[in-house]
Amino acid sequence: IGEQDQVTELVDVRWHAATVDRDQRETSAGHRGCVIWFTGLSGSGKSTLANEVDKQLHARGYRSFVLDGDNVRHGLNASPSLLESMHGEAFAKRFGLGFGPEARKENIRRIGAVAELFTQAGIITLTAFISPYRRDREAVRKMLSETDFVEVYVKAPLAVCESRDPKGLYKKARAGEIKGFTGINDPYEEPEKAEITIESEKNSPPVLAEQVLVWLERAGVIPSRKK
C-alpha cells in the first residue's frame, strides 16, 4: 500500500443522507425505483430489449435509464488498453478491468453500486450485461432491497446467438482468437430464480418489452394502465 493509500484508509468516510429522500422522488416520478437486470448470452437481445423497455417507459412519462455493458466499458469500467492511452501503464494496470473472472466480478459489482444509487433516486434502471456468473448477479441482488432487483433472463439458443453475432465475436471465439468467451469456452450460468424469462427469438422487441411492462405493473413498480 502506498503512502497516499494509507492516508486514505484513515479518512472517516460517512454516508450523507439526502435532503430529498427516495419516497419523495418516487412520489414525484409516479413510480418506484428499481433495477431491471437483463442477463443472457452475447447476441441474445439484452440491449435491444432493454432499450425497447426504456423507450416504452419514457413514452409513458416515467424516469428510466439504460446502463449498457458496452457503454460502461468506455469509461467507468474501461479496459487496461483503453486507460493506458489516456493515463499511462501504471494507472491502467491498477484500475483497468479486463474480461477474466475476477475482472468480470468487479465489473458487475461496480454496475450494481451505480444501479443502487439510481434506484435511490427513484429511477427505473435497466442494465444489459452478459453477467455470466450466478454468484455475481446474486451479489447485486443482495445490495438492494428485496423488491428492488428484477432479474430478466433473455433466453436464446446458442445457435441463434451465433447466427446473429452482430460483433463477429462468436466467429473469433470459434477461431481461437478470443479466450474465455461466454458460451464457447467459458460457461453461462442460467438464472435459477429470475423474475422474468424472455425467449427472445419468439417475438419482436416491442412484444417482448410488453411482457416486462406487464410484470412491472403487476409488481406495483409502475401504475397499471387504465382499461
Task: Go through each PLM region and give its residues.
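Small-molecule kinase domains that catalyze NTP-dependent phosphoryl transfer to phosphate-bearing small molecules
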Residues: 155-211, 219-227
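Conserved substrate/cofactor phosphate-moiety recognition/catalytic segment
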Residues: 51-116, 120
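The conserved Walker
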Residues: 42
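Loop/turn-to-beta-strand initiation segments
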Residues: 63, 121-125, 150
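Conserved phosphate-donor/acceptor-positioning beta-strand/loop module used by diverse small-molecule
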Residues: 126-132, 144-164, 198
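Conserved lysine of the Walker
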Residues: 46
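Extreme N-terminal, non-catalytic leader segments
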Residues: 1-35
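Conserved catalytic network of the ASCE P-loop NTPase/AAA+ motor domain
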Residues: 116-123, 142-147, 188-191
